[in-house]
Amino acid sequence: MSKRTFQPSTLKRKRSHGFRARMATVSGRKVLARRRAKGRARLSA
């Protein structure tokens, strides 16, 4: 049996995919812009 590879951590999740992480880079801002244009209810994790 192999172990489950997804070991959730709220801190790691927020640091890599959170709103402030997105806003920190130009490409991250583009991600948010695309999601706003698409009409997503949640822009980031």
Swiss-Prot record:
<dbReference type="InterPro" id="IPR020939">
    <property type="entry name" value="Ribosomal_bL34_CS"/>
</dbReference>
<protein>
    <recommendedName>
        <fullName>Large ribosomal subunit protein bL34</fullName>
    </recommendedName>
</protein>
<feature type="compositionally biased region" description="Basic residues">
    <location>
        <begin position="11"/>
        <end position="20"/>
    </location>
</feature>
<keyword id="KW-0689">Ribosomal protein</keyword>
<dbReference type="GO" id="GO:0005840">
    <property type="term" value="C:ribosome"/>
</dbReference>
<dbReference type="GO" id="GO:1990904">
    <property type="term" value="C:ribonucleoprotein complex"/>
</dbReference>
<dbReference type="Pfam" id="PF00468">
    <property type="entry name" value="Ribosomal_L34"/>
</dbReference>
<feature type="compositionally biased region" description="Polar residues">
    <location>
        <begin position="1"/>
        <end position="10"/>
    </location>
</feature>
<feature type="region of interest" description="Disordered">
    <location>
        <begin position="1"/>
        <end position="26"/>
    </location>
</feature>
<comment type="similarity">
    <text>Belongs to the bacterial ribosomal protein bL34 family.</text>
</comment>
<dbReference type="GO" id="GO:0006412">
    <property type="term" value="P:translation"/>
</dbReference>
<dbReference type="GO" id="GO:0003735">
    <property type="term" value="F:structural constituent of ribosome"/>
</dbReference>
<dbReference type="InterPro" id="IPR000271">
    <property type="entry name" value="Ribosomal_bL34"/>
</dbReference>
<keyword id="KW-0687">Ribonucleoprotein</keyword>
